[in-house]
Design a protein with these regions (language model features):
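Alpha-helical support elements that line or immediately flank enzyme active sites
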Residues: 9-16, 21, 25-27, 77, ...
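Accessory "access/gating" subregions that flank catalytic or transport cores
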Residues: 1-66, 118, 125, 136-137, ...
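Active-site rim segments in enzyme catalytic domains, especially the processed small/beta chain
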Residues: 33-35, 175-245, 273, 277
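Short, well-structured alpha-helical segments that form the helix of a local strand-helix-strand
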Residues: 21-24, 89-103, 277-287
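Short Gly/Pro-enriched turn/cap motifs at secondary-structure boundaries
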Residues: 66, 155-159, 224-232, 319-323
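Extended C-terminal subregions enriched in glycine
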Residues: 230, 272-322
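Internal maturation/activation junctions in enzymes
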Residues: 82-182, 194-195, 202, 210-211, ...
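Glycine-rich phosphate/pyrophosphate-binding beta-alpha loops
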Residues: 60-69, 167, 179-190, 238, ...
């Protein structure tokens, strides 16, 4: 009924009137802070997508206040300097390189990124190919870099589990990659009585205190500090990869801090390792995010010999505490047609018409 009401009335059907009354009543029951005035003053904003290139492909992804697109482009720019196909999918050298790239990018995320209405993030720097080459120049193929020794780049040198993603394309090639979230399972755990929906706990995406991790282990600094009217930094990474200026891969995923690396690995699986889209989506994944200083791995994602080699290089490896990393949903378009891939890690499906 809530969705039907919003369909009939539009924006005011949620931010004013009956639904707004129900939200405020639930807030008062739970000793919350949101008022009618807060709801009335909220407005969505159009933000330009982040743009990048990788091995001849063009990318469009989500900009701030999501860190996803910026960090995805930064990581791909770093990886472009290495012979990825020669390294081999999920080999010791490949996982080692991914981890070193991810820890540097997530260090930049923690230091530099926040709502651009309140902060001046060095986006040109973070998406610049020269910066990426300099950022990874201290990479050693033989040794892991302890995260304590990895610092954010200097901008003066240059300029959940309750997240849902959908990828859609129509017969004319118009594509949409969309991600929506209430953060953790059931959000804040408060159901709006009479409204039939849960309130989110997106405040956890802010940095409550510099260096203190949130529910996903992510840390941040002043760029993502709590301020009135400010939007928290997220990891949502809805992305469209273009080939010859036309949509080639439409993809995205839930998964909190693992969203960005899930999208990264899926793009690499297709564009570097020549996997079909379902194989690329289903392939085992790993994740690293600077802090904590570990490689998080799905079951069977790292074979024993590779694991021993990574440990010899100095990496710590842990089983991912939620077992599965991300829940990718993707569409690939080529001369043979449209191919949808739903991740078996969750309740996902692919459908056509």
């Amino acid at each position: 009924n809530t969705l039907k009401h919003i369909t009939r009335v539009g924006r005011d059907g949620f931010y004013t009137g009956k639904i707004a009354d129900l939200i405020v009543a639930e807030m008062q029951r739970g000793i919350g802070l949101i008022t009618h005035e807060d709801l009335l003053n909220y407005e969505s904003k159009y933000r330009e997508p982040v743009k990048g290139t990788f091995n001849g492909f063009n990318l469009l992804s989500m900009g701030l206040p999501s860190s996803g697109g910026t960090i995805l482009v930064e990581m791909l720019n770093m990886l472009e300097n290495f012979p990825l196909q020669k390294l081999g999918w999920n080999s010791s050298d490949y996982i080692h390189l991914l981890t070193e790239v991810e820890r540097r990018a997530y260090a930049d995320r923690a230091e530099h990124l926040g709502d651009s209405d309140y902060w001046q993030p060095p986006l040109f720097m973070l998406t610049n190919k020269k910066y990426a080459k300099d950022r990874i120049k201290d990479f050693s193929p033989d040794h892991a870099t302890p995260s304590i020794n990895v610092f954010a780049g200097d901008p003066t040198i240059y300029e959940s589990r309750e997240t849902t993603h959908f990828s859609v394309v129509d017969k004319d090639g118009n594509a949409v990659s969309g991600t929506t979230t209430i953060n953790l399972s059931y959000g804040g755990g408060f159901l709006v009585e009479g409204g039939g929906f849960f309130l989110n706990n997106e405040m956890d995406d802010f940095s409550s205190k510099p260096g203190i991790p949130n529910a996903f282990g992510l840390v941040g600094n002043d760029a993502n500090a709590i301020e009135p009217g400010k939007r928290p930094l997220s990891s949502m990474t809805p992305t469209i990869v273009l080939k010859d200026k036309k949509p080639f891969i439409i993809l995205g995923s839930p998964g909190g801090s693992t969203i960005i690396t899930t999208v990264l690995q899926t793009i690499l699986n297709v564009t570097v390792h020549n996997m079909g889209i379902q194989e690329a989506v289903s392939a085992p994944r790993i994740h690293s995010q600077w802090l904590p200083d570990v490689i998080m791995a799905e079951p069977y994602s790292i074979i024993k010999d590779v694991e021993e080699s990574l440990k010899f290089k100095g990496h710590k490896i842990e089983s991912y505490y939620w077992t599965k990393i991300g829940e990718m949903n993707a569409i690939l378009i080529n001369e043979k047609g449209y191919f949808g891939a739903a991740d078996t890690r969750g309740e996902n499906t692919a459908a056509g018409y």
